[in-house]
């Protein structure tokens, strides 16, 4: 919980006389990656019109990590999609921005009559994608155009 200690020290001889000027000593505590990312919700819900073009934004997912994200990568969260159900008409209909968690359409062919809803399993991984991870669900409703 304490990131830095500031000490004030000086050297003295055996008889107590100063032999050096007083100096500040800083001790910086390095964060240990001891927390997993946590999504702000277990289930995220969003919607998008059928037939939209690739690149259309759908929603955003958010995860936080209690570890230090300023001096280390321990608290830097990277997002990815682990799975999409159903895999129709393509197994990759959506993408998630690695650093922001913004989910957008990546393929054409969204059709409400064919597939009214998609379920995505989203993963958040700390250490900028190389550490501990956790998952949440994103449900995308396809709206009639």
Swiss-Prot record:
Keywords, in A-Z order: Calcium, Cell adhesion, Cell membrane, Glycoprotein, Membrane, Metal-binding, Repeat, Transmembrane
GO terms classed as biological process: homophilic cell adhesion via plasma membrane adhesion molecules
Topology Extracellular: residue spans: 1-145
Pfam (any one): Cadherin
Main location class: membrane
Location of the protein in the cell: Cell membrane
PROSITE patterns noted in UniProt: CADHERIN_1, CADHERIN_2
GO molecular function: calcium ion binding
Topology of this chain in the membrane: Single-pass type I membrane protein
TM stretches of this protein: none
Annotated glycosylation sites: 24
InterPro entries: Cadherin (IPR039808), Cadherin-like_dom (IPR002126), Cadherin-like_sf (IPR015919)
Assigned GO CC terms: plasma membrane
Domain Cadherin: 1-39, 40-145
The record's note on its domains: Three calcium ions are usually bound at the interface of each cadherin domain and rigidify the connections, imparting a strong curvature to the full-length ectodomain.
Assembly behavior: Interacts with CDCP1 and CTNNB1.
Protein task: Cadherins are calcium-dependent cell adhesion proteins. They preferentially interact with themselves in a homophilic manner in connecting cells; cadherins may thus contribute to the sorting of heterogeneous cell types.
PANTHER family hit by this protein: CADHERIN-23, CADHERIN-3
Name of the protein in its database record: Cadherin-3
Organism: Sus scrofa (Pig)
Name of the encoding gene: CDH3
């Amino acid at each position: 919980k304490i990131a830095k200690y500031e000490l004030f020290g000086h050297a003295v001889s055996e008889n107590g006389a100063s032999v050096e000027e007083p100096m500040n000593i800083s001790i910086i505590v390095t964060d240990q990656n001891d927390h997993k990312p946590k999504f702000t919700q277990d289930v995220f819900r969003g919607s998008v019109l059928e037939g939209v073009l690739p690149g259309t934004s759908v929603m955003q997912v958010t995860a936080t990590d209690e570890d230090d994200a300023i001096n280390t990568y321990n608290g830097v969260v990277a997002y990815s999609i682990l799975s999409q159900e159903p895999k129709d008409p393509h197994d990759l209909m959506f993408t998630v921005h690695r650093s922001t968690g913004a989910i957008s359409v990546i393929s054409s062919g969204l059709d409400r009559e064919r597939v009214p809803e998609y379920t995505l399993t989203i993963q958040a991984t700390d250490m900028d994608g190389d550490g501990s991870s956790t998952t949440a669900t994103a449900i995308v409703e396809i709206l009639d155009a």
